[in-house]
Amino acid sequence: MKSPFTTTVRAVVASIPKGKVATYGQVAALAGHPGAARAVGMVMRTNKDTKAVPCHRVVGSTGALTGYAYGDGVKSKKLMLEREGVTFKGDKIDLSTSGWKPMA
């Protein structure tokens, strides 16, 4: 059985649109737990349904790609994001253009 926190985090991540990313901290805040970025990382690490919960769309606070448990790891994560149209500046995501800005 999943905790209410896990269920909420998964729902937030499921709502990140293709071509956009959210930071771990942003997901934590949207889930009602500001400051719980590391806990969001734990939820993403145990995600088994990457189609319903696109954990590759969750990134570090600076736009840096962080761990990814599938395929070739971060290399696979970057390729998936590029295919979705996410823009990069060097090795980091350009959060000004590809950062998700959900409706308040």
Per-region residue spans from a language model:
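Nucleic acid-binding interface residues in structured DNA/RNA-binding domains
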Residues: M1-A104
